[in-house]
């Protein structure tokens, strides 16, 4: 049987399953066949999502553990090459794939939750909202502004109307979205990076440490090596003071930095930082707990109030050898970070900064 005949055969089988799968009576509707499979998948993932989102990233209890382990099981069935096809497919193709794969269904559901929250939420004065979209992609919304860092997502460009600026730590596709970047340019909104230069003398492009002010946000950067040894001066680390109306929230996002303190000094040793940050967002380091190298009071170090360990369940990576860290590994690593309040958030979750603490 040649390839064309095989494809026709498979399509005919799917059509037949779909036709046979519809039955109902006066009182009940039972969905079976292929439609039934999709219905059951959606119901199962929605239940897991609600179970997860009824918990807090700050409390790792049995309910949260159960929900995240279910998501891990979903992710284990999604291969990196399949995810690559999903990312590059036409919209309808990707939507259909998201309906038929559990972790992709959750990926889409989490996206819709964050997008709706960013669009519709009102941020109380003196507070800030911190959303995890996917991988190391965070969106922070304050009473006076909204920005994203390392937003990589199949539908990332839909956030462009709601972001005032975008930060990109480095040129690896699990940390940026070309569609979102272009949408930001089209709206004449700043994109801060060390490699994007849409026009000559673009003020938000730099390969050295910089300071920026955008609205109420004050931003410092430093340039660090990637954790892959050959990539020198490849990652921009961002320190962002979100302003008084955000309750004075400060955060550092490291991207895929290799955590060499000497490269952080332009941020950490600055007078306005003084070796302290409210929220540190590091990646799960593949090289033996080096996250702790930048935690402390010495040169190039900070003492964080909270650590949000990220780069977990990155579906574009094949396995843990390729930095697709499991939730179980993340919990173990979090327990070894030199900050008592270290947590592992999941896609679609929101934390609120209020009265000097995360809620």
PLM feature spans:
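C-terminal motif of bacterial Sec signal peptides marking the signal peptidase cleavage site
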Residues: 18-21
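Metallo-beta-lactamase
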Residues: 23-132, 139-158, 165, 176-181, 192-248, 336, 344-350, ...
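Bacterial N-terminal signal peptides that target proteins for export
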Residues: 2-11
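Binuclear metal-ion centers of metallo-dependent hydrolases, dominated by the metallo-beta-lactamase
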Residues: 31-43, 204-215, 232, 265-266, ...
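Active-site-proximal loop/helix segments of hydrolase catalytic cores
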Residues: 153-155, 225-302
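Short internal beta-strands
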Residues: 168, 188-197, 306-311
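Active-site environment of divalent metal-dependent phosphoester hydrolases
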Residues: 155-157, 172-176, 198-200, 212, ...
């Amino acid at each position: 049987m040649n390839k064309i005949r095989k494809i026709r055969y498979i399509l005919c089988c799917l059509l037949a399953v779909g036709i046979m799968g519809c039955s109902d009576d006066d009182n009940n509707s039972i969905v079976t066949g292929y439609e039934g499979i999709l219905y059951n998948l959606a119901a199962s993932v929605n239940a897991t999502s609600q179970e997860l989102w009824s918990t807090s990233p700050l409390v790792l209890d049995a309910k949260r553990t159960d929900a995240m382990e279910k998501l891990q099981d979903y992710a284990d069935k999604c291969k990196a090459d399949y995810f690559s096809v999903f990312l590059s497919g036409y919209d309808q193709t990707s939507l259909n794939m998201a309906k038929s794969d559990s972790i992709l269904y959750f990926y889409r559901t989490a996206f819709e939750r964050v997008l709706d929250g960013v669009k519709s939420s009102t941020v109380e004065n003196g507070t800030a909202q911190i959303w995890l979209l996917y991988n190391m992609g965070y969106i922070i919304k304050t009473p006076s502004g909204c920005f994203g860092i390392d937003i990589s997502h199949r539908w990332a460009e839909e956030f462009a109307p709601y972001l005032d600026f975008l930060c990109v730590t480095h040129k690896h596709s699990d940390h940026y979205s070309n569609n979102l970047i272009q949408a930001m340019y089209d709206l004449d909104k700043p994109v801060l990076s060390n490699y994007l230069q849409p026009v000559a003398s673009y003020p938000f492009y730099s390969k050295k440490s910089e300071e920026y002010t955008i609205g109420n946000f004050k931003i410092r950067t430093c340039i660090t090596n990637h954790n892959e040894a050959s990539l020198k001066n490849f990652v921009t680390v961002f320190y962002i003071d979100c302003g008084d109306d955000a309750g004075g929230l400060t955060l550092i996002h490291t991207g895929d930095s290799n955590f060499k303190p000497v490269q952080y000094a332009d941020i950490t040793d600055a007078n306005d930082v003084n070796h302290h940050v409210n929220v540190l967002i590091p990646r799960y380091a593949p090289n033996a707990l080096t996250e702790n190298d930048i935690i402390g009071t010495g040169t190039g170090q900070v003492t964080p109030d909270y650590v949000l360990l990220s780069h977990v369940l990155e579906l574009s990576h094949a396995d843990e050898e390729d930095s697709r860290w499991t939730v179980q590994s993340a919990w173990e690593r979090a327990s070894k970070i030199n900050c008592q309040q270290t947590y592992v958030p999941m896609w679609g979750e929101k934390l609120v900064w209020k009265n000097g603490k995360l809620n």
